[in-house]
From Swiss-Prot:
Its EC number is 3.6.4.-. Its main location: cytoplasm. This is Actin. InterPro entries: Actin, Actin/actin-like_CS, Actin_CS, ATPase_NBD. It comes from the Eukaryota. It catalyses: ATP + H2O = ADP + phosphate + H(+). The lineage of its organism: Eukaryota, Viridiplantae, Streptophyta, Embryophyta, Tracheophyta. It is found in: Cytoplasm, Cytoskeleton. It comes from Gossypium hirsutum.
Amino acid sequence: MADGEDIQPLVCDNGTGMVKAGFAGDDAPRAVFPSIVGRPRHTGVMVGMGQKDAYVGDEAQSKRGILTLKYPIEHGIVNNWDDMEKIWHHTFYNELRVAPEEHPVLLTEAPLNPKANREKMTQIMFETFNAPAMYVAIQAVLSLYASGRTTGIVLDSGDGVSHTVPIYEGYALPHAILRLDLAGRDLTDALMKILTERGYSFTTTAEREIVRDVKEKLAYIALDYEQELETSKTSSSIEKSYELPDGQVITIGAERFRCPEVLFQPSMIGMEAAGIHETTYNSIMKCDVDIRKDLYGNIVLSGGTTMFPGIADRMSKEITALAPSSMKIKVVAPPERKYSVWIGGSILASLSTFQQMWIAKAEYDESGPSIVHRKCF
């Protein structure tokens, strides 16, 4: 990495639902596409159509009617490395149009992930893509960088996993990190179920994508769930209609806030877990008593599942109810929070002080994949 001046590091935030990729120093990711690999359900009959045996990302999304869609990442953990390799290949060569052997690569992962997951990521980057250097950073820590803070508790909720990470003066407090395997995809599944009760059937992997779109466009979080339910029974003010791809129009009312309510009441989908407000509170309570005040005053939301309207107010209300009465509570919801992990990665990879943190290919060749645990937090 001697002539590191003209080489921009690549930042790749591999989410369960979306891949966000781009160049360090940019203020937004260049490529954002679904983490999907699709394989044809039918056999091709027309010669010369150039049919592929696998489609990745947006192309898989647009041809979803004839494909079986698979997500290689579930709950933040890669469960299909061949497909994951296809996604990275697509990211580097088709989306960013770069040669990975010429750029250091910064990858992200969820906290409390299995060690093997991180080692395999390292191995693929060095052995398959021949990266000159790489680094694996924790997603929530990057979100805090992006918000310009060094102290705070980050609630990062994406498509596959939510986690709370308290950070004090730049140090993550690993004993207080909590992870909740409840996130956007579970909400989409919950909405599929609720809509089935209404007589609309969504079953295939392609139809799940339609429901995800309904969720993203129409769902919101009620400040007072019970009261909102009462209102929805008597008035039709919250009903909205959505046009399906085939032109059929469906109306959704109470489903709009029933679906994301699962974040606060996981028992609604039969999960025995604390909601996001309680998880955040529990995480703060695991920290030293002297720093709790700073954490309560800097609760930072990040990730796509925190994009629901009303989430910051509700979060504030729920945590105020749990915390000591005199405590000042501030929930920060930056407008760019959907991409704040990526933005934080872009900031981190372009810091001059970060340059000695990279794992170089030579170090990898010497020690093997386990080096990632020594060099990355």
